[in-house]
């Protein structure tokens, strides 16, 4: 059957759920889709199992992959990512959180903030999630009003500690499970949450007037049609028929024509900043493009290997290193969707960098990545985030 056109009349925002494992992120995601579909008759109610992804990932009792769902309120259309909660899957959290104009931080009222609550707030700050709204979940399990107030204060303090406006952030108390089970008073709390999200998270200022660029998240082949690259358009606009360059990782760049654009399985004439899309590329084989590269308007961005950056090194308490590092330290640098190994050179007079410090450093990557001044990245070793930084100048 022919694909229906995507409705652009409502403003669009990308949000997601973050928080500690088992605090109820996926249940809340299911509850939002269910309550909104029930109230408006629009959108599709998603069951917990449908969001929680592939079976082998659920057997370990944790969500590994990033699930994308869509729903709408009266004023907006949302694309929602359910980010994995477990520390082993921080890598996915980083790719998921990078897709967010705002986040819903889920905290179990019964447990209060936990290590990953802190880690996800930190990650949100580092990957540039500008606004968070808090959902205190499992409030049906807490009878003590004072305890709820205490947990709320604790969450607000934690947000302030990481430069979010803890005093102003909306905090909604509710129960995702009870709402999912259709209990009216708890359904109201979901509506209250979505009203807060509508009002508190501003309509994102899109970079759609800048030149087109999209980090590649995934690549697959469609028999008879060609190769599709998926990702979130970081800036600019892409029209069917445009020429784009595939840049990064490899030394040589490749030009191609975009022969089709789709979003949520619907065809578009064009895509713009903020859209999660699949772009069909003419004459590109599956082997010629990979995650970590970018699609960009020809001549607007170049891959680089050497830059200076301002970096914050996580303290031991934040889950960072326990020991200092020195020049010639070789961690992974996580740009947009991929890790690339790089060598660190510390400025003259700085012998070593302690956990909890911030420092300037020069980085030399082993493969070129499309970066600019202001591009953010994480520093990781063995799958663990140990620092975060921003490119200050490009040297090569």
UniProtKB/Swiss-Prot annotation:
Task performed by this protein: GTP hydrolase that promotes the GTP-dependent binding of aminoacyl-tRNA to the A-site of ribosomes during protein biosynthesis.
Originating species: Shouchella clausii (strain KSM-K16) (Alkalihalobacillus clausii)
Record EC number: 3.6.5.3
Gene: tuf
Residues engaged in binding Mg(2+): 26
SUPFAM superfamilies: EF-Tu/eEF-1alpha/eIF2-gamma C-terminal domain, P-loop containing nucleoside triphosphate hydrolases, Translation proteins
Ranges in a coiled coil: none
Region (G4): 137-140
InterPro entries referenced in this protein's UniProt entry, alphabetically: EF-Tu_GTP-bd, EF-Tu_GTPase, EFTu-like_2, EFTU_2, G_TR_CS, P-loop_NTPase, Small_GTP-bd, T_Tr_GTP-bd_dom
GO cellular component, as recorded: cytosol
Region (G2): 61-65
Stated name of the protein: Elongation factor Tu
Reaction(s) catalysed (UniProt annotation): GTP + H2O = GDP + phosphate + H(+)
Enzyme's top EC category: hydrolase
């Amino acid at each position: 059957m022919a694909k229906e056109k995507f409705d652009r009349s409502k403003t669009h925002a990308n949000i997601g759920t973050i928080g500690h494992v088992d605090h109820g992120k996926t249940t809340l995601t299911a509850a939002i889709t269910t309550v909104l579909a029930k109230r408006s008759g629009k959108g599709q109610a998603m069951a917990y199992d449908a969001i929680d992804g592939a079976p082998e990932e659920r057997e370990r009792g944790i969500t590994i992959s990033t699930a994308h769902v869509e729903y709408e309120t009266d004023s907006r259309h949302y694309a929602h990512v359910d980010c994995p909660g477990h520390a082993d899957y921080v890598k996915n959290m980083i790719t998921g959180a990078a897709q967010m104009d705002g986040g819903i931080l889920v905290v179990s009222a019964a447990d209060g903030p936990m290590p990953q609550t802190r880690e996800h707030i930190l990650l949100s700050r580092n990957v540039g999630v500008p606004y968070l709204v808090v959902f205190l979940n499992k409030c049906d399990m807490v009878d003590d009003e004072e305890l709820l107030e205490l947990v709320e204060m604790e969450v607000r303090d934690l947000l302030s500690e990481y430069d979010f406006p803890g005093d102003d952030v909306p905090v909604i108390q509710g129960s995702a499970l009870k709402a999912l089970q259709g209990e009216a008073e708890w359904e109201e709390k979901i509506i209250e949450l979505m009203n807060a999200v509508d009002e508190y998270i501003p309509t994102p200022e899109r970079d759609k007037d800048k030149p087109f660029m999209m980090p590649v998240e995934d690549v697959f082949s469609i028999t008879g049609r060609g190769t599709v690259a998926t990702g979130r358009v970081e800036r600019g606009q892409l029209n069917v028929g445009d020429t784009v360059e595939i840049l990064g990782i490899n030394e040589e760049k490749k030009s191609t024509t975009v022969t089709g654009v789709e979003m949520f399985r619907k065809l578009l004439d064009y895509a713009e900043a903020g859209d999660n899309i699949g772009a069909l590329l003419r004459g590109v084989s599956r082997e010629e493009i990979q995650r970590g590269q970018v699609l960009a308007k020809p001549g607007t961005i170049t891959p680089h290997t050497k830059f200076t950056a301002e970096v914050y090194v996580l303290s031991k308490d934040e889950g960072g290193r326990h020991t200092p590092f020195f020049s010639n330290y070789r961690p992974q640098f996580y740009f947009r969707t991929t890790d690339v190994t790089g060598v660190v050179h510390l400025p003259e007079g700085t012998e070593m960098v302690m956990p909890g410090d911030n420092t300037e450093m020069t980085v030399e990557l082993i493969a070129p990545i499309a970066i600019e001044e202001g591009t953010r990245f994480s520093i990781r070793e063995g799958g663990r985030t140990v620092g975060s930084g921003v490119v200050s100048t490009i040297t090569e």
